């Protein structure tokens, strides 16, 4: 069985490049700061589709720059470990890190989903209680109606029926307070997107560890660009969806919220499979 880098260089890029694009798409679907911040920002400023695309591309640009720095740094450092006796150990260590990352992502997603389900159940209970109370007091009907209507002014996509983790809710609420109804310039939109994309991600670590094993700059660069392309597709789509009201999609298709909630599970499984693949090759190389 050939080495991991040799398999890629001899024509297996057709599998790993689409996988990198898929990884980027799934990373963009994960509950995280960049996606939620952009959606909340576009909704708060009542942004256009053009502004949403601009914001998504800016976030992708900065996110890609971070991945490039990490990947190039890893490829530079890997030159010190060219001996065949050392490479299998690097693959095995990389596999352990990747599998740990995948397990952490899976656990974080499960915990966030449980918190959302508990909070949504509590919200439904309170809503039903208020309805019974208003029914018994005709005099307070107008006051209660106005109060309830005001209390349900939320950013689209941040309602009780849409899944978000704790960090997403906090950032969306903060952005809604700061930018609600304000007029912003294109420069401010670009700056917001660039800073929002600087947050590190577990998927970038996976791309880094794969590139370390490639020992081929062209294919390694292609992998990073493929990941960035997938991320750009998701971030731009999210921004445009916020601009044209993603709630309409949720109303027309009941499975929309479920898909957004379950996407991180697929992402963590994909990362885990990459870790298993690298681990098998590392273990095989050590035993030879």
From Swiss-Prot:
Subcellular localization, as worded in the UniProt entry: Cell inner membrane
PANTHER family assigned: NICKEL/COBALT EFFLUX SYSTEM RCNA, NICKEL_COBALT EFFLUX SYSTEM RCNA
UniProt keyword annotation of Ion transport present: yes
Composition bias type Basic and acidic residues, residue spans: 123-155
Residue segments, region Disordered: 123-166
Protein name: Nickel/cobalt efflux system RcnA
Ranges of the Periplasmic topological domain: 1-12, 73-85, 210-223, 287-288
């Amino acid at each position: 069985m050939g080495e991991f880098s040799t398999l890629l260089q001899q024509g297996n890029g057709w599998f790993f490049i689409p996988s990198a694009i898929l990884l980027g798409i799934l990373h963009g679907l994960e509950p995280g700061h960049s996606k939620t911040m952009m959606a909340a920002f576009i909704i708060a400023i009542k942004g256009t589709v053009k502004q949403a695309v601009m914001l998504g591309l800016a976030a992708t640009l900065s996110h890609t720059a971070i991945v490039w720095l990490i990947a190039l740094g890893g490829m530079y450092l890997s030159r010190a470990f060219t001996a065949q006796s050392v490479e299998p150990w690097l693959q095995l260590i990389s596999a352990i890190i990747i599998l740990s990352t995948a397990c952490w992502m899976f656990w974080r997603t499960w915990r966030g989903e449980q918190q959302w389900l508990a909070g949504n159940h509590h919200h439904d209970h309170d809503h039903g209680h208020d309805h019974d109370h208003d029914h018994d007091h005709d005099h307070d009907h107008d006051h209660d109606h106005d109060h309830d209507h005001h209390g349900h002014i939320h950013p689209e996509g941040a309602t009780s029926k849409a899944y978000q983790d704790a960090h997403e809710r906090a950032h969306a609420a903060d952005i809604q307070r700061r930018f609600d109804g304000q007029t912003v310039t294109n420069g401010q939109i670009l700056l917001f997107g660039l800073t929002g994309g600087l947050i590190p991600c577990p998927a970038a670590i996976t791309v880094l560890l794969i590139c370390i094993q490639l020992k081929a700059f062209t294919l390694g660069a292609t992998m990073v660009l493929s990941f960035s392309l997938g991320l750009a597709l998701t971030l731009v789509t999210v921004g445009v969806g916020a601009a044209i009201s993603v709630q309409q999609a949720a109303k027309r298709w009941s499975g929309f919220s479920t898909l957004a909630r379950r996407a991180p599970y697929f992402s963590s499984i994909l990362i885990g499979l990459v870790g298993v693949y690298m681990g098998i090759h590392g273990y095989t190389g050590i035993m030879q």
